Structures are given as C-alpha cells and as structure tokens.
Curated annotation (Swiss-Prot):
Pathway of action: Cofactor biosynthesis; (R)-pantothenate biosynthesis; (R)-pantoate from 3-methyl-2-oxobutanoate: step 1/2
Sequence similarity: Belongs to the PanB family.
Residues at which Mg(2+) binds: D45, D84, E114
Cofactor comment: Binds 1 Mg(2+) ion per subunit.
Record's protein name: 3-methyl-2-oxobutanoate hydroxymethyltransferase
Keywords attached to this entry: Cytoplasm, Magnesium, Metal-binding, Pantothenate biosynthesis, Transferase
A GO cellular component annotation in the UniProt record: cytoplasm
Gene name for this UniProt entry: panB
Amino acid sequence: MSKVTSSTLLKYKQEGRKFTALTAYDASFASAFDGEGIDVLLVGDSLGMVLQGHDDTLPVTTAEIAYHTRCVRRGIERSLLIADMPFMSYATPEQAMENATALMQAGANMVKLEGGHWLLETVTKLTERGIPVCAHLGLTPQSVHVFGGFKVQGRDAENAQRILDEAKALEAAGAQLLVVECIPESLATAITQALTIPVIGIGAGATTDGQILVMHDVLGISSGYIPRFSKNYLKQTGEIRSAVRAYIEEVANGTFPSSEHTFS
C-alpha cells in the first residue's frame, strides 16, 4: 500500500474524494488506525488534555510532542504523520526552525502551526528549508484565553473575511494543508473552494476536503466536556477497528459530519 503524501491529499481534493484524519499518540493505536486506512495521523497538542489531564493545550512541550511522534512513527506504514508545534514553540521564525527540525527528526512528515498573518514569514522560511507546513485557522486552541474560551469563530462578516484572507495568504506563503476548526460551514465552504491546497475540517461542516477528530472522542473515552462536533463511533460498533472503519465510511459518503455536528 503506497504511502500518503501531501500530493496524495491534493489528488484526493482534485478528484472530490473525502479523506480522514485522527489524532494518535502511541504506536499501538497508530498501527490500528493506519491499518484501517486513516489517511492522516496528527500527534496533537491535544495530548495535554486527553493524556495529561490539563484544562487546555498550553503546558505541552516540544519534547513531549517529539516523544509521541517517535512512538507513532514506529506504528505506521501508510498514513501521513503531522506533528503539532506547541504553544510558544514558534514565536519567531528562528525558534520555529529549531523546534520544527526536532519534530521532523522525530519522524513527522509535516508540522502544524496555529495562526494567521503573523505566521506568514515563518511558513515561508520553513517551507523553503524543506519542512512542510499545515496551517490552522478558526478556533486555535493555543489562543483559548484570547478567545475567552473554546468558542466558534468567524460568525460575523468581518472575522469571516479575515479568516478567509488569512487562509489565502497562508497558502501563498507555502502551506500545504490547512485545518479549520469550529467555524460556520458556509465559511469553511468558501475557504475550501478558494484554496488549491486540501482543507481539513473539525467542527466546520461537511464541505471540507477532509475531516479530523480526536481519537478519544471517536472512541468515547474523553472525560469532561464532549465537543458538539465529535461522534462516539465505538458506541455504535463496539470494537475499535470497526469504529475507525465507520468513521472513514461516513466521511466518504457524506453522512458525517451531519447538521448536529455543524455550526452556522
């Protein structure tokens, strides 16, 4: 089975084929997800909440992301592996270069950064030096205290236009993928149609090129707050691999996300 690359995902977008992504943090789960056909695995800073028990993602370090990236890398053969760059690990282009290099050396195929216009120089410099970038707009969890909580972004015309403009600028700067989180489906549609690169949604409706969820939500093992955009597939299937297959199938046929998982 051929490895998934950014070119693979671009081809999927051009063909109108929906693809799936999940977070993963260890070799065993990563191997199961990879074996069932998940296209993209993300070592997310969400590990700060679902593994470490923090209230947000801010305490996570680059060393911790690198550790889990090495674990996941050992478990996969096909999936594209993205590593999150944690809070304040890319405040300057120079800092971003150092930390992104560490994550690539740990086994990542790409790094993910949260932010808009202020990141353009960093995205360009990383890309020019051979480090592929996945950008992240909308609800960016590392900015949770700026937003005043985990809230839907881009509902008013001004902010929607800003997010759309930032998406275009990040693509022009060299980003190869874009994640949009917790934005209205209409805005996600506009972004997906405006960009050549693939767009991955989470809480952004069904029109993006791909979908991503946190594995703990898919398997129904999250504690505390359960996001509206998530779905417990283990509850309906009773087995982990079957849950992953159900997620892949529902994304492919357009039944997930449905209106109950979508914001307006």
